[in-house]
């Protein structure tokens, strides 16, 4: 059985929100993300979210950062975009935001501007290995300064890996297509335990782009 991302996510998008379970790992993911965003000097006013799903991260950012004045949320699934619209329009926001929702995959997406922050949560892990380099190159063109992707990451892929999940070497791929002065960091998402920490196998990858011409 092969994995076709477009077909898979169009079908899964119809039932994703209904089957979604908000657990302690999702909550921890959000806590780590907010803590990390709070550590970034300055503010981000424009945000591009790719693979927004039903709007979980969209809502998280819009309710926590009143500096955001423009937000574009994109997803491959028309059903998920409708879910995201419903969630956000029913959410009280701290300020007025220019909001736009768009149905598109990343490969087909065309934009006429760059965004302060490009963010993806559990999206790139579903990109085929043959496509990941071209996708990351597009992310770099979309971003004015920051790219953040939150994804499953292990040193070695598990034996029973699902057909729609892939481990990519994000740091190495970002490094290939950015200036040497670009900052690339990985923040493992770990849960505290009584005698230490438990790795959730997820990480925040943060790229701070230097767009000066490469020598």
Please state what every model-predicted region is:
Residues 122-126:
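Short catalytic micro-motifs in class I SAM-dependent methyltransferases
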Residues 1-111, 127-215:
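Class I (Rossmann-like) S-adenosyl-L-methionine-dependent methyltransferase catalytic domain
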Residues 119:
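A conserved beta-strand element that flanks and buttresses the S-adenosyl-L-methionine
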């Amino acid at each position: 059985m092969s994995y076709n991302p477009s077909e898979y996510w169009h079908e899964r998008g119809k039932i994703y929100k209904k089957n979604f379970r908000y657990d302690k790992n999702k909550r921890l993911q959000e806590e780590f993300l907010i803590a990390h965003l709070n550590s970034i000097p300055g503010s981000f006013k424009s945000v591009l979210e790719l693979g927004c799903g039903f709007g979980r991260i969209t809502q998280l950012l819009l309710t926590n950062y009143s500096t955001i004045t423009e937000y574009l949320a994109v997803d491959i699934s028309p059903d998920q975009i409708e879910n995201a619209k419903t969630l956000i329009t029913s959410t009280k926001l701290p300020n007025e935001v220019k909001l736009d929702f768009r149905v598109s995959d990343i490969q087909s997406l065309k934009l006429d501007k760059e965004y302060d922050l490009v963010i993806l949560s559990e999206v790139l892990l579903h990109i085929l290995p043959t496509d990941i380099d071209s996708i990351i190159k597009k992310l770099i063109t979309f971003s004015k300064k920051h790219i953040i992707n939150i994804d499953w990451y292990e040193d070695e892929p598990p034996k029973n890996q699902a057909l729609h999940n892939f481990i990519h070497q994000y740091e190495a791929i970002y490094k290939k297509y950015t200036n040497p002065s670009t900052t690339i960091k990985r923040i493992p998402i770990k849960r505290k335990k009584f005698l230490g920490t438990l790795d959730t196998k997820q990480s925040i990858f943060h790229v701070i782009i230097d767009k000066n011409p490469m020598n």
